[in-house]
Amino acid sequence: MKIAVGCDHIVTYEKIAVVDYLKSQGHEIIDCGTYDNVRTHYPIFGKKVGEAVASGEAELGVVICGTGVGITNAVNKVPGIRAALVRDMTSAIYSKEELNANVIGFGGKIIGGLLMNDIIDAFLAAEYKPTEENKKWIEKMDSLQHASQDQNNPHFFDEFLEKWDRGEYHD
């Protein structure tokens, strides 16, 4: 599988370890940087990973910064990206199976490298399981990427809120 990987300067060594691990598993890597510990800004590298995935150059992406919050938010701004900040296998699998996530984000200073590798493996092995419900959710999320008239509609999520009120969701 072809995977784009990017990070900021705080977690360069963690990214290098992830890249080495993925290569050892037979994956082709697009290393979007950064490549050293010189101060930089995570949005640059989130954008690069997002563009590689959205364009089809890469099948999936992995982004890493200190907490994971900044770079995951940045990559989510790229149209066509559905990124999830994860810290466990359950969240990673859910993000792929239910939300068709195509990028996962990590806090490289939050979780250890071995756990990160296990979570990446779980994410890569998971497959999207389309249902009518999650297709609708994904469609709604994707429509938020463009300024649309629907987005400004105060009833944008009514369909789902009504189901909640009827007790149709069993979390």
Curated annotation (Swiss-Prot):
The keyword Isomerase applies. Gene3D superfamilies: Sugar-phosphate isomerase, RpiB/LacA/LacB (3.40.1400.10). It comes from the Bacteria. It catalyses: aldehydo-D-galactose 6-phosphate = keto-D-tagatose 6-phosphate. Coiled coil: none annotated. GO terms for biological process: D-allose catabolic process; galactose catabolic process; lactose catabolic process via tagatose-6-phosphate; pentose-phosphate shunt, non-oxidative branch. One of its GO terms (molecular function) is ribose-5-phosphate isomerase activity. Pathway: Carbohydrate metabolism; D-galactose 6-phosphate degradation; D-tagatose 6-phosphate from D-galactose 6-phosphate: step 1/1. It is an enzyme of class 5 (isomerase). Its EC number is 5.3.1.26. Signal peptide: none annotated. It holds the Pfam family LacAB_rpiB. InterPro entries: LacB (IPR004784), RpiB_LacA_LacB (IPR003500), RpiB_LacA_LacB_sf (IPR036569). Keywords: Isomerase, Lactose metabolism. Heteromultimeric protein consisting of LacA and LacB. Belongs to the LacAB/RpiB family. This is Galactose-6-phosphate isomerase subunit LacB 2. The gene is lacB2.
